[in-house]
Regions:
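The Walker A/P-loop phosphate-binding site
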Residues: 12-123, 128-130
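Short, flexible loop segments at the rims of nucleotide/cofactor-binding pockets, characterized by
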Residues: 45-46, 151-152, 187-189, 215-220
């Protein structure tokens, strides 16, 4: 069993709040105010049940919130990320989704995709998938490579992006492929909690969505380390991507404030583009036939 570090629970006197009574008053919720439901950033499919004659889209993520794409190593998480990015812009991306509608609601807001793991070659090839699938280069798509940056530099860049840059007023979604590379120790309770609090602040202040990619523990569906535990608790949606050999299955593990989207599968075509496959439907038909036999 991992030993607890008492320093993780010590209060930093530098963080003591001044004028705490005023701060307390600012946190009181006015229950008379009318608050709109957070607008969607991305949806996957539609509810089978109609409400008032309308089949509503099923949430992948909404503005002001955090989602996670998780899976074991080499489960094709980055391919799933590319598929979602392309579908967020629309264009010809529907050619890659069969009958499943993956839809974005960013308008002209920026989608900024950050990679902390891949080499220059792989980063470029990954970034090129989006314009290839969309059919053109979206004006509001930016892909960044932070592999060579230190953890401290990545944190400073994130802070600048959300709080100081010219993009902050028009951020739609940030996708962080390699969340673990933004902390020194993914098992440090204090560090991971502070980092998660920053992400929550960033998404709230800019009213944008953040989607992070994280590994699962080996042979488990639990997200790795204290970082995974804390982020998983705060995320409004957690997707698990599981490698099934020729294809990967994508399913919603948890979602807050809505119904989970239906599981779907992806394969990779001969141009290294991800597409929604019919493997689940095919397996269901085989199982039905075997049951009849």
């Amino acid at each position: 069993m991992e030993k607890l570090n008492i320093k993780d629970f010590e209060i930093n006197t530098e963080d003591v709040i001044e004028n705490i009574s005023d701060v307390f008053k600012d946190t009181i919720i006015d229950i008379t105010q009318i608050v709109d439901r957070p607008p969607l950033a991305v949806s996957i499919g539609y509810d089978d049940k109609a409400y008032g004659g309308v089949h509503y889209p099923l949430k992948f993520g909404s503005m002001g919130n955090i989602s996670l794409i998780t899976g074991q190593e080499k489960s094709r998480k980055t391919f799933v990320k590319s598929l979602i990015e392309a579908c967020t812009f629309g264009g010809k991306s529907n050619f890659y989704t069969d009958t499943l509608e993956i839809k974005g609601y960013l308008g002209d807001k920026y989608l900024i995709s950050i990679d902390t793991e891949q080499s220059l070659y792989d980063s470029v090839m990954t970034a090129k998938r989006v314009p290839h699938m969309v059919g053109s280069m979206p004006d509001n798509y930016i892909s960044l490579m932070w592999r060579e940056k230190s953890t401290k530099e990545r944190l400073q860049l994130l802070e600048w992006l959300y709080m100081e840059s010219s993009y902050k007023e028009n951020l739609g979604m940030v996708i962080l492929d390699g969340v673990v590379d933004c902390v020194q120790d993914f098992n440090s309770l204090t560090e991971c909690k502070e980092f998660t609090e920053k992400l929550m602040k960033y998404t709230s202040v800019t009213n944008s969505h953040l989607c992070g990619l994280l590994h699962l523990n080996p042979n488990s569906d639990k997200i790795r380390g204290h970082l995974g535990t804390i982020l998983g608790q705060k995320a409004e949606m957690v997707m698990i991507v599981e490698n099934k050999g020729e294809y990967s299955e994508c399913k919603c593990k948890v979602v807050r404030g809505g119904k989970p989207f239906k599981p779907f599968t992806i394969q990779i075509d001969d141009q290294w583009m991800p597409y929604v496959s019919d493997d689940l439907e095919r397996l269901e038909n085989i199982n039905k036939e075997n049951h009849i036999l």
